[in-house]
């Protein structure tokens, strides 16, 4: 028989997913759906951590990173988590962590995870801008806040990425990505996430702003004189449209599909 906790987890995820599907059909604001999906996963991960991490779990920080760290999830988005250890000696005790991850797998929630110390985070961020970017958007789910704040301070140092170096690396990354899409936003089957003008470009603005200004929201970019109020409204409108397209693609296909393929275009159009 399926263990009771596993069954409850499966049922909670299924009910939450169906609720989001219905709310999309009812044309609820997409911003609420994207954030509520992240909140739903928060509840599941916190509960699973409390159940399975064991007594040493209280000394370890469970942290949402990447898009999940931003509090933005689509139905089949990547869910990425960092398990932050206070010191390397604890790394040998993986039993509670393994139980936690196995439970998530059993209930059908695939979570990409890394297990690191603060020194690991600092070293790997300095070596790879994609790691630095993922950790910029960290959000504490469970565990000691002092450990989480110590990681944030370590990663904020210019020795990891100065604002200028980070900006240049993200521009180079963007140019390479655009080139893979033939430098055009006008493909007949665009990728709403990675094509020029897609969600990744909007996210890049947020990453650079966070590294340079410490800005947590796009609204703060108006305060810094980086955007006008009119530009902010346009940006939010574009983001909401792309979010709805991506959310609907995941619902229609039941998988992480970000390409606006011909097969989906008519059905998707009827949802707008």
Model region roles, listed by residue range:
Residues 1-272:
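A nucleotide- and high-energy phosphate-metabolite-utilizing enzyme signature
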């Amino acid at each position: 028989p399926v263990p009771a906790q596993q069954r409850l987890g499966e049922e909670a995820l299924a009910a939450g997913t169906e609720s989001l599907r219905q709310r999309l059909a009812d044309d609820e604001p997409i911003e609420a759906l994207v954030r509520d999906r992240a909140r739903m996963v928060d509840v599941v991960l916190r509960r699973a951590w409390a159940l399975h991490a064991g007594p040493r779990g209280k000394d370890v920080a469970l942290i949402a990173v990447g898009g999940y760290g931003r509090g933005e999830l689509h139905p089949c988005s990547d869910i990425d988590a960092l398990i932050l250890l206070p010191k390397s000696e604890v790394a040998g005790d993986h039993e509670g962590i393994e139980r936690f991850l196995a439970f998530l797998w059993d209930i059908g929630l695939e979570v990409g995870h890394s297990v690191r110390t603060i020194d690991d985070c600092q070293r790997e961020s300095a070596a790879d801008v994609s790691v630095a970017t993922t950790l910029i958007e960290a959000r504490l789910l469970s565990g000691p806040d002092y450990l989480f704040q110590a990681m944030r301070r370590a990663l904020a140092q210019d020795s990891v990425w100065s604002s200028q170096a980070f900006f240049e690396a993200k521009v180079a990354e963007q140019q390479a990505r655009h080139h893979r899409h033939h430098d055009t936003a006008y493909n007949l089957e665009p990728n709403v996430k990675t094509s020029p003008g897609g969600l990744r470009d909007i996210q890049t603005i947020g990453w650079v702003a966070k590294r340079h200004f410490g800005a947590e929201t796009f609204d703060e970019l108006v305060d810094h004189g980086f955007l006008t109020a009119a530009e902010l409204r346009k940006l939010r409108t574009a983001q909401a449209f792309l979010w709805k397209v991506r959310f609907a693609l995941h619902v229609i296909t039941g998988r992480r599909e970000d390409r606006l393929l011909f097969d989906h275009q008519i059905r998707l159009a009827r949802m707008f």
